[in-house]
Amino acid sequence: MQRRKFLQSSLAATAGTAVGTNNTLTGNVPAASREIYEWREYEMRFGADQSQLENYFKTALIPALNRHGVKAVGVFKEWRPTDPAKFFVLTPYASLEQRLTIHDKLKTDQEYIKNSATYNSIPVDKALYSRFTSSLMLAFEGWPAITVPASAPRVFELRTYEGYSEDAVTRKIKMFHDGEFPIFQRAGLNPVFFGDVIAGDRLPRLTYLLTCANMEARDKGWAAFVADPEWKKLIGDSQYANTISKISNSFLAPTAYSQV
């Protein structure tokens, strides 16, 4: 219990710092009304039976998260698979408190424990992955909750912007709020979430997820985005100079059981 209180206060302090710097953006949206996103990346071991991990997601983890109040869990694979395979899991929580509460509840959830039995009995010499990475994000003030797209075949683009300092990332987040959201929508680049990363690697950074019907629509969307007059105004504003030092992106496909 003491550990949980420490984690909650520590992460809340980190989130509070982000909120304090971003409150000027669009009108004092408190952190309590913005979702917390956990993003996990699993890299499978060579030759591992990935169906065992997927069965765990389908029959144990996702149903348990749903029971405890998480409305939609996203599970994705790479658009163009690599070897070893990778899986990506997006869990949107209503708050940091919900994230910590569910972490504790899963330890005593008998249905989850039963449904996880096969997964948990995998021997060490048949481990599915070495480790998974995890990051926590606080939703942007101007996009405080996840937008779940229609359940149809589509491509997702995960984009990460790293900054050379906290101020650089804060200024980039302000740039989103000062005009980028409607440009994305006009261009047909459909946002799923925007997150200010408050715990994880490669900090400081922000991450967001877009979706389109296919790669052709994605390419047309970005062409429209960079040609938009409002975008040209934004990039000409000196306050947004040197906000990004590195951009990385990944193309993802939802699994058949993904809820996002």
Label the model's feature ranges:
Residues 7, 100-104, 160, 173, ...:
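Non-transmembrane alpha-helical segments in soluble domains
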Residues 252-259:
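Short, low-complexity, Pro/Ser/Thr/Gly-rich segments in the mature regions of secreted, periplasmic
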Residues 4-25:
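N-terminal export signals
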Residues 34-45:
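Acidic/histidine-rich, surface-exposed loop or edge segments in extracytoplasmic proteins
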Residues 39-41, 88-92, 158-160, 207-209:
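Conserved hydrophobic/aromatic beta-strand scaffold that supports enzyme active sites
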Residues 43-53, 59-68, 72-147, 165-167, ...:
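Hydrophobic, ordered structural segments
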Residues 139-215:
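Surface-exposed interaction/gating patches
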Residues 19-33, 62-88, 94, 178-207, ...:
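Short, glycine- and small/hydrophobic-rich beta-strand elements in well-ordered beta-sheets
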